[in-house]
Amino acid sequence: MVIDKSIPKATAKRLSLYYRIFKRFHADQVEKASSKQIADAMGIDSATVRRDFSYFGELGRRGFGYDVTKLMNFFADLLNDHSTTNVILVGCGNIGRALLHYRFHDRNKMQIAMGFDTDDNALVGTKTADNIPVHGISSVKERIANTDIETAILTVPSIHAQKVTDQLIEAGIKGILSFAPVHLQVPKGVIVQSVDLTSELQTLLYFMNQNHLD
């Protein structure tokens, strides 16, 4: 199967949603799904579904629908969801603690293997109820040196985000999901995905206000 390497970011962001939909269809024992069924489940139009799928070659035949099991496995391969991906969490404040207790592995094959915070944080040296150890940030390089961990969730205050990012990159981290509302400078080969809760809420309020004006 030929995959177009120049996949738009908007399409890339929908990949996990497609995977979730096909897993749901599979659980409901749906064998074939049309682009309209997929679109309705996603809250988008069927033309967007067909355009997204076109980047991955021939996923289905027009008029026959899409094989649910085949597509579920395809997206599992694409998202590397056949094997468990271990990640670390850096910053055990309110958001960080909530994420430490979130059971990623119940929904996907991802799990937080370790938490990190400032060396003097009271949580350092303890474990969560799910047996996740919390370490001091100064030990991050040695802690992940002999592991397969390349991904970090960053939930530190904005003023510390860049410094901690530099430490993570030096330790070998290649991907960062950042909750800090600042732009992070990273070298080529390191990917940052930002989650700005304030921005998302403001966007929601904007669209709500637009609805009131209509």
From Swiss-Prot:
- Which residues are listed for NAD(+) binding in this entry? 91-96
Give the top-rank taxon of the lineage listed in the UniProt record for this protein: Bacteria
Q: Which residues bind DNA?
A: 17-56
Molecular function (GO) terms listed? DNA binding; DNA-binding transcription factor activity
| Gene Ontology process terms (BP) | negative regulation of DNA-templated transcription; response to redox state
Which locations, inside or outside the cell, does it occupy? Cytoplasm
Q: Which Pfam families match?
A: CoA_binding (PF02629), Put_DNA-bind_N (PF06971)
What GO cellular component term, any one, is given?
cytoplasm
The protein's UniProt keywords, in alphabetical order, are: Cytoplasm, DNA-binding, NAD, Repressor, Transcription, Transcription regulation
Q: Outline what the protein does.
A: Modulates transcription in response to changes in cellular NADH/NAD(+) redox state.
Subunit organization: Homodimer.
What family does this belong to?
A: Belongs to the transcriptional regulatory Rex family.
**Name of the molecule in the record:** Redox-sensing transcriptional repressor Rex
The organism's taxonomy opens as:
Bacteria, Bacillati, Bacillota, Bacilli, Lactobacillales
Question: Its encoding gene is what?
Answer: rex
